[in-house]
Design a protein with these regions (language model features):
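NAD(P)+-binding Rossmann beta1-loop-alpha1 motif at the extreme N-terminus of oxidoreductases
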Residues: 1-36, 40-43, 179-181
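Small-residue helix-packing motif on alpha-helices
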Residues: 20, 48, 184-191, 213
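Rossmann-like NAD(P)(H) cofactor-binding subdomain of soluble oxidoreductases
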Residues: 27-28, 37, 45-120
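Internal alpha-helical scaffold of NAD(P)-dependent oxidoreductase catalytic cores
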Residues: 93-101, 117-155, 166-205
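Short pre-catalytic strand/loop immediately N-terminal to key active-site residues, enriched for Gly-Thr
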Residues: 102, 152-158, 210-215
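NAD(P)-dependent Rossmann-like dehydrogenase/reductase catalytic/cofactor-binding core
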Residues: 193-259
């Protein structure tokens, strides 16, 4: 996701390669990033943050303690930490880095192609201008929604953060179902992918609610109605709700666990 951010910023010319420095312990990764984007690369977190307006934390939760230790005492008062580390709370970041200007965001994987959505929040010390900058950075990857309460970040994780996996799972099931009907897998994948893509675009452009669009497709006594009956009898809505509640609970658990 860190690469998604820098790629989006460079593609949309919101900054220049010289404005970006990345710290990574993996030599092949550093070599790739330097060649691909022309940015500065280093293994030293302290060097990477020098003269940067925003310090992006794009590391796995288990690597957060080491990263925060490197940042402690090195950040200038006007620098902002933008964390996309899943399940890592603002309190954890603030305590570890000894810093109070923090933006916490939860993007999702479609950000890699500029079609993501990020939920985010910020501490009260983050200025209006810095919030605008955070909005610009996150918006470069797609859309963004600001929340006053950090608790919503766990909910965002359950909806849009984990959401792509839900759609992949449903797509898998539809593809397998099409194969069972007799289609070869290539044709099954094409039918399902274009149906999902077209439906998403139609839902985005139509003023109608999803339920109304569904009813438009569902003729009384027809094939779609029969399929919908099976979904409803199997408790699809309840299953989806239960899954999202479980994801939200897990996000809270991860936030309560010291990384």
């Amino acid at each position: 996701m860190g690469e998604a951010i820098l790629a989006a910023l460079l593609e949309k010319k919101l900054c220049k390669p010289a404005d970006i420095a990345v710290s990574d312990i993996m030599e092949p990764r550093r070599r790739y990033l330097k060649k691909q984007y022309g940015i500065t690369v280093t293994t030293d977190n302290k060097k990477a943050i020098v003269d940067r307006d925003v310090v992006v934390l794009a590391v796995k939760p288990q690597n957060i303690p080491e990263a925060l230790t490197d940042l402690k005492g090195q950040l200038k008062p006007d620098q902002v930490i933008l964390s996309i580390a899943a399940g890592v709370t603002i309190n954890t970041i603030s305590a570890g880095a000894g810093h109070n200007k923090i933006v916490r965001a939860m993007p999702n994987t479609p950000a890699q192609i500029g079609l993501g959505i990020s939920g985010w929040t910020a501490t009260q010390e983050v200025t209006a201008a810095q919030k605008k900058l955070a909005r610009t950075i996150l918006g470069a990857m797609g859309k963004e929604i600001y929340f006053d309460n950090e608790d919503y970040l766990d909910k965002v994780t359950a909806v849009s953060g984990s959401g792509p996996a839900y759609f992949y799972l449903f797509a898998e099931s539809m593809i397998d179902g099409a194969v069972d009907l007799g289609f070869n897998r290539k044709d099954a994948e094409a039918l399902v992918l274009q149906t999902m893509l077209g439906t998403a675009h139609l839902m985005e452009k139509s003023p109608k609610a999803p339920a109304e669009l569904r009813r438009d497709v569902t003729s009384k006594g027809g094939t779609t109605e029969r399929a919908i009956e099976v979904f409803e009898q199997s408790g699809l809505a309840q299953i989806v709700n239960k899954a999202m509640q479980a994801a939200c609970r897990r996000a809270k658990e991860l936030g309560e666990t010291k990384p």
